Design a protein with these regions (language model features):
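Non-catalytic alpha-helical scaffolds and adjoining flexible linkers that form interface surfaces
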Residues: 1-263
Length: 263
């Protein structure tokens, strides 16, 4: 890669030198790319830059907020023709940014991406859904709408990572039964749990992140991610995210919890 024009979003950054930072960029062309560039690149805004380097750590130069036309990668070659790649002037592009509590949701999306996605693996469909999610987070959303936005994005992420959630059958291909109880194991699927009726509620309260009633699973499969099924999907997705992260804490989740305590 030599002086290649990229369009992407900054997911994460770390101090590197006095005037430079280590960036995790989610690019339209190559997926997540690690690079070093001048400090002060903004989050949640489309960036246009140039990347150079043969190894995993690239050099990023001319980092600027992309013009709205360039967010669809108009700056790179199409049909063998190099279009104008002049970066937009930062002050000249009137993008609205994400503010308030929605920032915590956007930070969460960024964190699960930079921690879970492989480097330099193009994911154009997920990149488009990331853009859509950021646009949603710039709008006024109720608590339910915010959670729906996150659950829907997580589902696209699971698909890219190769996880298919089967909710119509258990781990041995028997149909889900409404009056049964199931435990979800990410690498196995839904396992029937043999309990007496009087023990069912106690089991669910002790292992709430992994145990589901059959009737709830059937409803999830029938309706998808809706306000009616949102709490069940949130429980399932959280367990799968934690599994993928090897149960290491998410900093964005901790920030959200701290913010909620001080409200």
């Amino acid at each position: 890669m030599r002086n290649e024009a990229l369009v992407g979003y900054l997911l994460h950054q770390r101090p590197y030198q006095e005037k430079r930072a280590l960036y995790y960029l989610f690019s339209q062309q190559h997926g997540v790319i690690h690079g070093v560039g001048k400090k002060a690149a903004p989050l949640f805004m489309p960036l246009q830059l140039f990347a150079t380097g043969k190894r995993d750590l690239k050099t990023f130069s001319q980092i600027n907020i992309a013009s709205q036309d360039n967010t669809q990668a108009d700056s790179v070659q199409k049909d063998g023709v190099q279009k104008d790649s002049t970066p937009a002037v930062l002050e000249a592009v009137p993008y609205a940014n994400i503010s308030g509590q929605h920032q915590y949701a956007a930070l969460y999306i960024n964190e699960i991406l930079w921690r879970l996605l492989p480097t330099e693996d193009p994911m154009p469909i997920l990149w488009q859904h990331y853009q859509i999610s950021l646009q949603q987070l710039k709008q006024p959303l109720s608590n339910s709408e915010l959670r729906l936005c996150l659950r829907q994005f997580e589902q696209y992420l699971f698909t890219e990572l190769g996880f298919t959630l089967t909710l119509t059958h258990d781990n041995v291909e028997d149909p889900i039964e409404s009056d049964s109880t199931y435990r979800f194991l990410p690498d196995v699927g839904l396992l029937p749990v043999l309990v007496h009726n009087e023990e069912s509620e106690h089991l669910a309260s002790e292992s709430g992140q992994t145990v589901f009633k059959g009737a709830d699973i059937i409803e999830m499969a029938r309706l998808g991610i809706t306000e009616q099924t949102l709490s069940h999907w949130s429980k399932l997705h959280r367990h799968l995210i934690d599994h993928l992260l090897d149960y290491q804490p998410l900093q964005s989740r901790l920030l959200w919890q701290q913010q909620q305590r001080y409200q």
